[in-house]
Amino acid sequence: MASNNSTSQLAALAAFKAINNKKNEESQPNNRSRIPLKVDTTAPPQTQMKALNSATRAKSSNKISQTQADKTRGQTSERKDQKTTPTGSNMTNIFKMPNTPKTPKISKSAETPNSVGASRRSSTYSNSFAVESLENEPPKNDNFGEPLSTVNNLERRKTVSQHSLNYDPQDMIRNVKNSIGSKYISNDLSPGQVNTKRLSTGTQPKDMLDSVRNSINSKTKTNSKNQEMSQRNALILNGIRDSIDSKRISSHHDNSTISLPLAEERDKILKSISKSNNPEEQLMLYGQPIYNYSSSSFASSFSENDNDQLRTPVIIRTDMDLLDPDSNASIQHDERENYSNEDDDFEYNDTYDTKEDKEVSPINIPLSSHACARLGISNNDTPKTFMNLRIQTPDKEDSSRLKPKRKPPPEMDNDSISPTFTEQSDGYQTEGDDRMSDASSNRTRRHSVQYNDYGGYSDASSKSQIKVNDDSDYSYFDESDLSGSETPSVEKIDNDKSFLDDRLPIFPDIKAKSRKLFRNRKSKPIYNSDDPDTSKSDLQSATEELKNISVPSRTSTPVMGHQSQPVQLKATMRTNKKREKKYSFNENKPWKNHSELSYIAESERKRYEGLWVSNKGLYINCAVSRFIGVDYNGKPEIESQIENQDAPTTAALLSSRTTNEDNSNVVQQNFHNLLSAETSQLIHGVVVKRIWKRSRLPKETLEAIWDLVDFRKDGTLNKPEFLVGMWLVDQCLYGRKLPKKVDGTVWNSLGNVGLNVVLKKKGRR
């Protein structure tokens, strides 16, 4: 019964379905699409008719795109769809019609004629679905809460439908053209005009060529202007050099040879350099290429952007101008007063005075003989100008004043000192420190004592000397040391000795002196109690008589004679590494070793000499100014005389040269090559500046180092000056401060700078 009822219900549903389809086709227009609804299987069978119709329409509308693919694929796709249909209990049940002869089979793969028609209708009316949905929606409110007008909504919906239906490519092209025209209007340009920022299609190739030609012509005009300016500058430089050459040639010295090239040669060189595209030729200075390519040489890295032209370094100078001898003497006197203090000699300044308002000017080069002839200065005045170049060094008295004074020893109390007498073979010996009659007499005594050739000290102020004992312990007395107005004679002292020999006790021999720093100074006299002739009262009377005789103290005079020390042989072959490590120089802590701070070490000197050898004599021949001590005419007079004379005469000339150099000023001038110098043994200031700049020290410190080292005052340095300057740069990098003046020990540590002898140690190979 249940099966019969179900079949009857299904048949009724199919009949109602066909009737409703006909009614809907007649009543609804063609331009409307139906809204799909979901099928609810839980509803009673009477209400499932409408749901079934809506479900079939929705399924057909969603599978419009799949129908074309199904036609090509065939039945294989339909079989796959049947296999992949969900059959789970949780999924919604799809209603299937029973297989009856009256009703067709309803399944996912089989399509009824009605469903096909519905799919066609949905495909034709799918474009108007959005319009229908918008018309059915109620009017919405705008952003301010007011309802929008229905007329505007309808117009907007119609425009949306029209834009959705316009798929013609010609319409798309028109829209693009309209957008381009709107851009021209926004930029205030008509469509026929050309924008300067971008080339439009309307520009012709002739116009493009004309614009390119105009740009090229404008660039050539600017280049021609630059060339004219460079030619003008070159002409100005040539005029300056010609004026210098003419002034030098017009002087009365006909034998002078000029090492500078002529103006015509310079013009040729400059033209060849300007025309050549080779960068190596453009680095040449006055047409002379750089041949030094060593890594340690300065010439390998000479070209820089900041300073391409060769010129003397600009140095701040305070008191470097040529002054009169009287003014030089006053300056020298002021410097001595500044260095008269004891503490200032060996302390470095905490701050180096750098004034911004100092005048920055090139180095003033002293007048040469040619310049003196041009200015009309007589030859008698020229030596005065060279005398001003004399190095001002303190005298011996000032140097003694500069040395540190040792603190005098503390004065001993009078009561704490008591003499002790001992008796040996033929005399007596005193031990302990005795006082002088007065402190002033002690000081005069200390200065007047002089050392004898025979191993003793003598007094220069007194005439008579008295020797008390002939043994190893020497003691000399003069008249001022003896108390009282009467001067005792030698015979009287001999009588006193015989008196003392009878009364004083005999002491045992002293084997060795005690070398303790704090020995017992209050030692009581030792006497022999077995001797019946001696007594304490006799000893006291003897000591009172000899107290008046003042013995020179050991603090004022050194110990006489040479004390033999026992020879200690080395017991092991080990070295004391702790001691060597303690006293060795530590670069990380240079302030802990003060013994090597006042002279240049051998390793440092070799390192600086390597820089000197690779950079000496560079670009000196290219300089315009003359240098001090360089003979541009030929060889010096003394060397020419030595070459022309015989062997005995040359030896005499050399010996006379050594005797003349005893003067301190002459020695200093020879040390700094002020009298005679070779260009190959000088280094230019530009090279020194570039080398010192690599240390990255401040500019003020480098200028101060140059002022301390520069004695030539012509923009060059010789070998010792360059070595000391490099040493000062290293000391600044270590953390030391620059001194007011370079100590003489630093200059003396260089020794014979010209000699470089390597001694090989003889040993096993």
From Swiss-Prot:
Family: Belongs to the IRS4 family.
SMART domains assigned to the protein according to its UniProt record, in alphabetical order: EH (SM00027)
Domain (EH): residue spans on this chain: 663-753
Comp. bias regions, Polar residues: 43-69, 84-93, 109-124, 187-204, 415-428
Lineage: Eukaryota, Fungi, Dikarya, Ascomycota, Saccharomycotina
Ranges of Acidic residues composition bias in the record: 340-350
Domain EF-hand: start-end pairs: 697-732
Location of region: Disordered: 20-124, 187-206, 321-362, 390-466
Keywords: Lipid metabolism
Protein name: Increased rDNA silencing protein 4
Cytoplasm listed as a keyword: no
Gene for this chain: IRS4
GO biological process, one term: lipid metabolic process
Sequence ranges of Basic and acidic residues compositional bias: 70-83
CDD domains, per database record: EH
GO cellular component: cytoplasm; plasma membrane
